[in-house]
Amino acid sequence: MSAQMEEPETLGKRKESESSKLRSDETPTPEPRTKRRSLKRACVHEVAVPNDYTPTKEETIHGTLDNPVFNGDMAKTYPFKLDPFQSVSVACLERKESILVSAHTSAGKTAVAEYAIAMAFRDKQRVIYTSPLKALSNQKYRELQHEFKDVGLMTGDVTLSPNASCLVMTTEILRAMLYRGSEVLKEVAWVIFDEIHYMKDRERGVVWEESIIFLPPAIKMVFLSATMSNATEFAEWICYLHKQPCHVVYTDFRPTPLQHYAFPMGGGGLYLVVDDNEQFREDSFVKMQDTFPKPKSNDGKKSANGKSGGRGAKGGGGPGDSDVYKIVKMIMERKFEPVIIFSFSRRECEQHALSMSKLDFNTDEEKEVVEQVFNNAMQCLNEEDRSLPAIELMLPLLQRGIAVHHSGLLPVIKELVELLFQEGLVKALFATETFAMGLNMPAKTVVFTAVKKWDGDSHRYIGSGEYIQMSGRAGRRGKDERGICIIMIDEQMEMNTLRDMMLGKPAPLLSTFRLSYYTILNLLSRAEGQFTAEHVIRHSFHQFQHEKALPDIGNKVSKLEEEAAILNASGEAEVAEYHNLQFDIAKHEKKLMSEIIRPERVLCFLDTGRLVKIREGGTDWGWGVVVNVVKNSSVGTGSASSHGGGYIVDTLLHCSTGFSENGAKPKPCPPRAGEKGEMHVVPVQLPLISALSRLRISVPSDLRPVEARQSILLALQELSSRFPLGFPKLHPVKDMNIQDTEIVDLVSQIEEVEQKLLAHPMHKSEDDQQIKSFQRKAEVNYEIQQLKSKMRDSQLQKFRDELKNRSRVLKKLGHIDADGVVQVKGRAACLIDTGDELLVTELMFNGTFNDLDHHQVAALASCFIPVDKSNEQVNLRNELTKPLQQLQDSARKIAEIQHECKLEIDVEEYVESTIRPFLMDVIYSWSKGASFAEIIQMTDIFEGSIIRSARRLDEFLNQLRAAAEAVGESSLESKFAAASESLRRGIMFANSLYL
């Protein structure tokens, strides 16, 4: 295997070790540094200024609004010369004006934040530093405490020095302080929002937006962000909101230039695709593509050697791990360490790290230091927890300079890995993308083990912003002349896809603003009434972006109308009629299946070997084979159960080779075009069956061997060739003997429309262009309709309608009275933002919690906390079954009331998404005194995820205790306090190493 790779000139041409399987037979001569590095230290400064604003700063000291320069005494000096963007940022801060600093990871944004803190200290004022995650808050606290000493921390888990001049906190804590009218805010001059691009988070983005809206005008803001394409728009919103200037300082300069290499998995080495002048090398990309097998012209699904066109996640011949092994080994031999290897699956991280068992990167002296640091860190745990497998197995790995970092690790291990990495004692770190967030922990080299990731809906290519964020970890300022990025590619891909990924524009920051009951109730209960829900809606970034986009939408409509006029409309009526017949059949069949799929009708036909068609949302799995049917005990006896939600059908489905049943990938998905794929048993909810065939095939008794499962795939392919028009389906009346009048009528309607479709002249027409032209025209007309509707419907009016409907819900549930005055129930809900405030207050007031002991309370409350979904069946002990049923019934009631009040809500979806019973048994056992070693045997959820959920549960229970206290429920208050206390022990609540 040959590798083509430019080496940093400081290393010269090193002789390659004979033992390496990844040699460099051709090393280009590095260009002279002056020629090679042509990027300027570009710094763009813009400022949004309110109308009629008159600056009052003295120009000799502060420069002008358009050209800020500071000529006074610095609040803080640095041991290095500031970059242009840092100097301009300091000048803006000294003007006492808000600023957004948008720059790459490692560019030096922290220096700007530190200057704002130093200014506050100099001027005897207080400053708040917010971060999106508790773990990042802990890290930032340690860093700032080392620099400034007078620093406090408030995260919900921990409160340290709350009277300090600089307070580090999560954004949720800041929002709560703003709602409560905290006295602290009267002394605050600056609020620093770190990682402001988190504002686009679907769940939590609204917290940032509300906090920014509620901040008093006297407080100035510093926003730190990764590069984003609409920084100016964001600054204009801040200017509009607070009637004060907001500066934008943007740089895409990287202090350490990067070289980006592609590695075709199972193929021929490394190919430089983007050089350190950010030029995409097309010739190198083409050479890389040529290493992949070419598909035959007569068969798009097979390559010339009979294998699929891509190499799959596992590579062409050897396993994928061997490719990672070769790359890591080559990196170490060339002294390109430390290296961060990014994977998009936690289990994959661990598997890759374990595959390095033969490699050792640390000296004996370094091993001793690692062991000493490890033992010191473990002192925060009790004796019992120190012997956990997750801890004992980590030391040998760490001593060899290899580590894993992902959200499922024990927090103490995760923090230990971070500290060892910063000290240079971890040379190869296998991490998920969360490591690219937060503190600056750069490496010399970054490796991506895949070009695609699962985002909860589909496997998609990494976005440009994601690639920029992670690749930004490559190249250590002042240490490396160049950083190196290597991306592993497992199949042919479009040149533009890779170019856009590596060099594309970062995504814009888009508002995810939404109305919550928590917000409405808190605004209604504020005595001063300064902000109303209407005010918040009107001043949201969402509304600002909508109004700004209107002229562009108008131009788009004009262009689409021109396209619609040009499209060939000959025979349009005939094509439309044919299209409508197809649509009618699909609509009737969907309705028919929803009736057929009821357990009492369908279960007797779901015998082993039955062919069933599976559709999940927009994903069509095609035909699979039934293996087994099991009852889902976590679903109660409500309507979800009667519609089949209470049953799981284990089905053999054709899956992408990237998926494996041991959970190496987050979720199975169908194979890509041209991919061979493998058959796997996938648990499928009964309602996802979209068709039942009359055909059955023989299923081997043992499906563990790959060969046994692949024999089913061959059988399905053979049946497909025998039935080219599709597998014969079970007839609801003739085969299933369903005599229900509604179903008989539906079947007749479908057969009638099918006859019309078969008789239609378009059915046998070969004029594909006519159909395509019609479909495109229909798409264009639909898009025009949608855009016009968007222009017509004010976002403000939509939110007003939603506010009115949500207020009706609050009245029906007794949170507010007819005049909108907050009642006792509403006062309790005002204090709860960690779980569903409506549902949990319902349980508080309907007596559900009264009948439970504090262990059951802790277990039931855990259902409100987001947690990784377990792949195992939820089997609950008797003490928890009834409380869960009561919770599900209450959730269904609340969802139905919201539906009645015209809110767009799917009742069963609400119940399923709001209630997460996966840790009920675990929390119950822990609350009753079980050891951590015992409870981790009860679930397949990662240890770190269990601890994170338990800590969030403790925060939730404290909010419930405060809510009970606020409404005078002393017995409930005691119960919630006891539930919280029963959790707070051992490794679950061990102190952070940063504190």
Curated annotation (Swiss-Prot):
It comes from Arabidopsis thaliana (Mouse-ear cress). It is an enzyme of class 3 (hydrolase). Pfam families: DEAD, DSHCT, Helicase_C, MTR4-like_stalk, MTR4_beta-barrel. Expressed in inflorescences, leaves, stems, and roots. Keywords: Acetylation, ATP-binding, Developmental protein, Flowering, Helicase, Hydrolase, mRNA processing, Nucleotide-binding, Nucleus, RNA-binding. The modification N-acetylserine is found at S2. This is DExH-box ATP-dependent RNA helicase DExH10. PROSITE patterns: HELICASE_ATP_BIND_1, HELICASE_CTER. Residues 10-26 have a biased composition (Basic and acidic residues). ATP-dependent RNA helicase that associates with the RNA exosome complex, with the cap binding complex (CBC) and with the NEXT-like complex. Involved in the degradation of a large number of non-coding nuclear exosome substrates such as snoRNA and miRNA precursors, incompletely spliced mRNAs, and spurious transcripts produced from pseudogenes and intergenic regions. Involved in the maintenance of homeotic B and C gene expression in the reproductive whorls. Regulates floral organ spacing and identity, probably through the regulation of protein synthesis or mRNA degradation. The gene is HEN2.
